[in-house]
């Protein structure tokens, strides 16, 4: 089974969602990216599991294939890793018409994508996401990034892939914690754009048990999430306006991630960020008083955290590095209801107070 979603950006491409797609990578890459050489960029967790079927499929389609592996983890989404991959690609004499294949989760996709965006001022790029979070979110939309000492995703480029190949079978090797972490972005998509999906997830949560019982249903849920992101990205490819809706929970969430030294997964941090902002919105009467409870309950049923022990000052200090900051303001996604969110330009002092209120702490905006 396979579901195909057309992404009609300035450089259109397709996302294929289904099972047994790793073995079809070669023909799919050949048909969309071309070239004669391919470098598979992967990490120490994913490579041993999936690099061989992808390599063999690419070779059967006429590619000369090399594999570049780096240490797994967000802490390696750094300039040193990026430069090492660039050097590897150059040593293997890739041309601009050749292809870099990202095989892994969001970190692999971000780093490999930035390499593809900058090597020889841009070469072909393919995403093969193997985590739930990467399938429903980071592999689609063309964002690539590195983390800097000052904060998350502060260096990067927009670089759309030639094709995205999401083999749902790869999810079977995730731990329950890794699978749950990906659900943070699933819940986010439902909140910002799809009340029906939210209600379906309330009735039947997305879990590894569901994957084992009904892989076709999981594939449909993943495709639905991709379609939500597709609609937003196509309307605003460079994130000047509407695409910022996808950042619901991210300004506080990225700050939590940095405070936790990237030891807490991105999806959990987004879930915490959604909880903070929604609780604050309810206190101000922006949304119904019941909304925070609904979102927190759905997150909890997916194994996600919505609260943390960090101080508002600590989170705010990290959030000052957020890309959505503009001088003394920051663009925040504010929930009004399921499927109804707005992008509000918010003074930093107000943002600090919202964080404090969402944490149940007293506000003190003196830090800004």
Which residue ranges define each predicted feature?
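ATP/NTP phosphate-donor binding region
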Residues: 1-99
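Residue-level signal for inorganic ion chemistry
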Residues: 18, 40, 78, 129, ...
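Non-catalytic interfacial helical region
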Residues: 86-103, 112-127
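Generic secondary-structure signature for well-ordered alpha-helical cores
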Residues: 91-94, 160-163, 169-176, 184-196, ...
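Short glycine/serine/threonine-rich phosphate/pyrophosphate-binding segments
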Residues: 107-114, 135-136, 255
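A glycine/threonine-rich phosphate-anchoring loop and its flanking beta-alpha core
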Residues: 114-207
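C-terminal charged capping/lid subdomain of soluble metabolic enzymes
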Residues: 184-187, 286-368
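Active-site segments that bind and position negatively charged phosphate/pyrophosphate groups
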Residues: 204-314
